Design a protein with these regions (language model features):
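N-terminal lobe/hinge region of extracytoplasmic solute-binding protein
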Residues: 65-123, 270
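Append "and occasionally in soluble cytosolic enzymes with long acidic Gly/Pro-rich linkers
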Residues: 290, 376-494
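Aromatic- and charge-enriched surface segment that lines or borders ligand/interaction sites
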Residues: 117-170, 196, 202, 322, ...
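Periplasmic binding protein-like
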Residues: 66, 143, 323, 328, ...
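Detector for C-terminal structural segments
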Residues: 387-423, 485-494, 520-640
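Gly/Pro-rich hinge or "lid" segments in bacterial periplasmic/extracellular proteins
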Residues: 103-105, 219-301, 308, 435, ...
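Ligand-site clamp/hinge motif
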Residues: 262-266, 294-342, 503-505
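Surface-exposed binding/hinge segments that line
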Residues: 168-252
């Protein structure tokens, strides 16, 4: 099968950030007392094609301090739950040994560090079995061996009703034979997962999930530590599929996963990535990672050379000052004023930094909740789009270093770049137009006043609509934080909403509370129709999950809670494209983007480029798109 670029990400589809966070930083011992030797190259622009594995003789040591936006660190330190952009950087560095990994061209292939041998078998019933033998030298951070049981356990755990009851993402293996029966608890066996030996196992993709454009991604899972998460339990296979012995219960994993002092969700005591968790303090928002000495490296042999990584909350207003003082190693500037000011200081020799351009891969958006209230109706979503001057807002926020996007992609997205010229003229470019906004509401039935009589502009303040026999007020509730984006939105949008008969009410809250409302965790009923957020657009995305209204996908994959037959149908068509048929996939991809542009599950506000400035002593650090700071740090090393 032709190797394809795959993005094994939820969220984010599922990854959330309110504002662009600063990058990272170094302890003062790394930047202070710098010499003026020839090895210190300052003011150098690095480009993506300069990335590589660190040299074999690169020194190991030093400390990188990652600047995070104050108030954004959540308790989650382990994969399997909704985590934001701040946490995902640390979690990613503690994760490893997936069966497939990306090369530096973002092409997914089997990881030779993990996979010793594999075989693909096409079965008579139309299903397809992937059989793996893993290497026998892999270890967890505690020194215990990683075996086939740990890979099988990962699938059994993350597709179990017990894990779902712990508010975890229980969608692992969703394309495999027997997934539905296992996740619903109908059978203890997972029919499409088989334990074949100490280092051998297999996964079988269901016939109804084939062909599948991202086929390899459906079996590219990593391990979980069976002995640590489910002590006393075992993985068995009697021929009908792998299963966990009777000791595996919800109470057991609640203790091992959710205990606030030692649970995996919060403390990640055993991992297999390049780094392991040394400590975490939510009060000071300090996360400290250290090298996992048991880690064998990525597919190309890349191993960590920075000894420790530590977080430091830094306000956006002071992040460059912190960098200049030598307390942080790198930071991102995302507005024209900040970019140009920093570049000028570098050119004048007043800012000790190297730098690189990072193309925009995130969309700032107004994320609609499409399952309740006025925003469940597409006419309301479009009406809001017509009362917002997106072009002017984007210009003010980025200083000209950004673009307004009209669909679910950015200019850095390869598939979109390939079809942009074909569909751009058909995309609606929503711009300020009160008449169009009002017409959308009229077309959507928002033609009544609070008495149920005909709405009269100039007399009645707010519009209403009869929904399920009752009057629904045209009122949208917005959850936001106290950032520049929110402040500007909340200044310009509410008065325009009043002009079309809409009440637009915003509530500012801290980041953690907003995340709880967004993820609907710890709340009785959803309250907010709109969240100001940003979302990363990976090179490859499971569109068929992101817009599927299956209850198990709502919130984790389908972040808009949208139930739209057209988006769902196109997504399923995209899934069924043969991996070899790139043109066929892109044709459907364009069709999807046009539908998204009309349905507006979210209103894209813009996408901006950023410049990352970093300590010149941090060598082999290459800013680039489609990876987070963690991948850049993993390549890097300090050179005094």
């Amino acid at each position: 099968m032709k190797k394809r670029m795959i993005a094994l990400m939820l969220a984010g589809i599922m990854v959330l950030s309110v504002t662009a966070c600063g990058g990272g930083g170094a302890s003062s011992k790394n930047q202070n007392n710098q010499d003026d030797g020839e090895s210190k190259q300052v003011g150098v622009e690095v480009t993506e094609d300069m990335q590589s594995a660190p040299p074999e003789d690169a020194p190991v040591g030093g400390q990188v301090v990652v600047a995070i936006s104050p108030g954004t660190l959540s308790p989650d330190m382990y994969g399997g739950w909704s985590n934001n952009a701040t946490n995902s950087g640390f979690i990613g560095l503690m994760s490893g040994y997936a069966l497939a990994d990306y090369n530096r061209d973002y092409v997914l292939d089997w990881d030779p560090v993990v996979v010793k041998d594999h075989e693909v078998i096409e079965n008579d019933d139309g299903s397809k079995t992937y059989r793996f033998e893993i290497n026998d030298n892999l270890k967890w951070s505690d020194g215990s061996p990683i075996t086939a049981k740990d890979y099988v356990f990962s699938l059994l755990l993350h597709s179990s009703p017990e894990f779902a009851a712990c508010e975890g993402d229980a969608t692992y293996g969703w394309a495999l034979v027997g997934y539905n029966d296992h996740v619903q608890g109908t059978t203890k066996e997972f029919a499409g997962v088989n334990l074949l030996g100490d280092y051998e196992f297999s996964m079988t993709i269901s016939a109804d999930q084939l062909p599948n454009y991202y086929e390899m991604a459906n079996v590219a899972y990593g391990p979980e530590p069976l002995a640590a998460i489910a002590p006393g339990c075992d993985v068995k296979d009697d021929g009908n599929g792998a299963y966990l012995t009777d000791g595996f219960t919800e109470d057991l994993i609640r203790e091992t996963l959710l205990d606030p002092d030692k649970g995996f969700r919060y403390k990640a005591p055993v991992v297999c990535g390049p780094y392991k968790l040394k400590s975490v303090d939510l009060t000071t928002e300090t996360v400290e990672l250290e090298i996992n000495e048991e880690y064998l490296g990525t597919y190309d042999g890349t191993k960590p050379h920075i000894q420790t990584i530590i977080s430091k909350p830094v306000a956006d207003e002071t992040i460059r000052d912190e960098f200049e003082k030598g307390t942080i190693d790198f930071y991102s500037a995302g507005t024209g004023e900040k970019i140009e000011a920093a570049l000028t200081k570098v050119e004048e020799g007043k800012l000790d930094a190297n730098y690189g351009l990072v193309p925009g891969t995130r969309i700032n958006e107004m994320r609609y909740m499409c399952d309740f209230g006025p925003t469940q109706f597409e006419e309301v979503r479009r009406a809001i789009a017509y009362i917002v001057d997106r072009d002017e807002i984007n210009k003010q926020l980025t200083g000209g270093y950004g673009t307004v996007v009209d669909c679910y992609a950015t200019d850095a997205t390869t598939d979109f770049a390939a079809i942009k010229d074909d569909i751009e003229s058909e995309l609606i470019h929503y711009s300020y137009d009160l008449d169009k906004a009002k017409q959308e509401l009229i077309d959507g039935g928002w033609t009544l006043n609070e008495k149920g009589e005909e709405y009269k502009e100039g007399t009645d303040k707010y519009r209403y609509k009869e929904v399920d026999g009752e009057l629904m007020k045209l009122k949208v509730e917005v959850a936001c934080c106290e950032d520049d984006y929110s402040k500007l939105y909340n200044t310009v949008i509410p008065p325009e909403a009043e002009k079309i008969g809409m009440e637009y009410k915003y509530t500012s809250m801290d980041f953690a509370l907003r995340i709880n409302h967004l993820n609907r965790q710890g709340i009785d009923e959803p309250e907010y129709n709109i969240f100001y957020s940003s979302i990363g657009i990976p090179e490859i995305l499971f569109y068929w999950n992101c817009f599927d209204d299956d209850p198990s996908l709502m919130g984790s994959w389908n972040v808009n809670y949208i139930s739209d037959p057209e988006l769902k149908a196109i997504g399923k068509e995209m899934q069924k494209v043969d991996p070899e048929d790139i043109d066929g996939f892109r044709k459907l991809y364009g069709k999807f983007q046009l539908a998204y542009n009309k349905k507006l599950p979210s209103l894209p506000m813009g996408s901006g480029v950023s410049y990352m400035f970093f300590n010149p002593k941090l060598k082999n650090f290459v800013p680039r798109a489609h990876v987070g700071w963690g991948a850049m740090v993993l390549d890097a090393y300090f050179e005094e």
